């Protein structure tokens, strides 16, 4: 929005030309989202307390979690608000990629909101009926996938980038839609499963989003894309604004979510942020790199799949409890230790992921 205003005002004062630079707008988007998050955080928490939107906990979970019952949830609302306002202010809204991410972010946010509301209304952890939850997640993802394919069909925007191989970029064709669907829905649910401890999901989200800000900038810059042997994608540069807005909103939320948490993001936050991360990875053609940098999310999701599969096939559990962060808690690790170690692992994976851009 401010891009349009600056384009008009630059004829009167060339200083407004600074708004045309992605680097300036990305910093401002981060600061705007951070300030909004810090500003509205306490108000949102008080409102959630008044509405009695408190967290329900699993009866079979670690005993240390019982004290979390009643902690305000659905704090993801403040994250979405901060990202939305920051993006509308600082992003170029003529860019279709911006709208694809916002569509997933707020579409999944609505699904997550309904899921959270049902958990609160029923006073259990079941939430929205699974088949309806995945139906709507799938519909939203497929609408985005078809739209993205229509814009980028038969161009670099629909190639698969393989880490470590600079000349291996197969054209996906219609398989692009299938891959996009699984990346968006899969990442959304993986982040949702990770969001079980104070600050456990939001910090890896911040790190990975920050890394994708760098990747989006490189992908949208022809010279850097050629230097790194990655596809140059016309619209991807503007995704830097969204990534930094996610970082800023995430930091603002972490202020209140750090151990011991004053608020939880709920499914309204985890489903939407995970979906946004997935669609950004698709748009910059780095789905495989997302698996590396988001390794913590992948392992959390795999631990649930393996646990359920093992129990159904062998009537035996692999872990003491899934997702895997609960396994470590039941082994005696204090919650802060689990959280910080997962953060450290994510930092290592993000750095490894960024290094692979050059190792080709």
From Swiss-Prot:
Lineage of source species: Bacteria, Pseudomonadati, Pseudomonadota, Gammaproteobacteria, Pasteurellales
Transmembrane regions listed in the UniProt entry: 21-41, 73-93, 98-118, 132-152, 168-188, 199-219, 236-256, 263-283, 288-308, 338-358
PROSITE patterns in the cross-refs: MRAY_1 (PS01347), MRAY_2 (PS01348)
The entry's keywords: Cell cycle, Cell division, Cell inner membrane, Cell membrane, Cell shape, Cell wall biogenesis/degradation, Magnesium, Membrane, Metal-binding, Peptidoglycan synthesis, Transferase, Transmembrane, Transmembrane helix
GO cellular component, one term: plasma membrane
Topology in the lipid bilayer: Multi-pass membrane protein
Reaction catalysed by this enzyme: UDP-N-acetyl-alpha-D-muramoyl-L-alanyl-gamma-D-glutamyl-meso-2,6-diaminopimeloyl-D-alanyl-D-alanine + di-trans,octa-cis-undecaprenyl phosphate = di-trans,octa-cis-undecaprenyl diphospho-N-acetyl-alpha-D-muramoyl-L-alanyl-D-glutamyl-meso-2,6-diaminopimeloyl-D-alanyl-D-alanine + UMP
Pathway assigned to this chain's UniProt record: Cell wall biogenesis; peptidoglycan biosynthesis
Cofactor: Mg(2+)
Keyword Cell division: yes
Protein name per its UniProtKB record: Phospho-N-acetylmuramoyl-pentapeptide-transferase
Main location as per UniProt: membrane
CDD domains: GT_MraY (cd06852)
Gene Ontology process terms (BP): cell division; cell wall organization; peptidoglycan biosynthetic process; regulation of cell shape
Molecular function GO labels: metal ion binding; phospho-N-acetylmuramoyl-pentapeptide-transferase activity; UDP-N-acetylmuramoyl-L-alanyl-D-glutamyl-meso-2,6-diaminopimelyl-D-alanyl-D-alanine:undecaprenyl-phosphate transferase activity
EC number(s) stated in the UniProt entry for this protein: 2.7.8.13
Compartment(s) of residence: Cell inner membrane
PANTHER family associated with the record: PHOSPHO-N-ACETYLMURAMOYL-PENTAPEPTIDE-TRANSFERASE (PTHR22926), PHOSPHO-N-ACETYLMURAMOYL-PENTAPEPTIDE-TRANSFERASE HOMOLOG (PTHR22926:SF5)
Similarity-based family: Belongs to the glycosyltransferase 4 family. MraY subfamily.
Domain of life: Bacteria
Function according to Swiss-Prot or TrEMBL: Catalyzes the initial step of the lipid cycle reactions in the biosynthesis of the cell wall peptidoglycan: transfers peptidoglycan precursor phospho-MurNAc-pentapeptide from UDP-MurNAc-pentapeptide onto the lipid carrier undecaprenyl phosphate, yielding undecaprenyl-pyrophosphoryl-MurNAc-pentapeptide, known as lipid I.
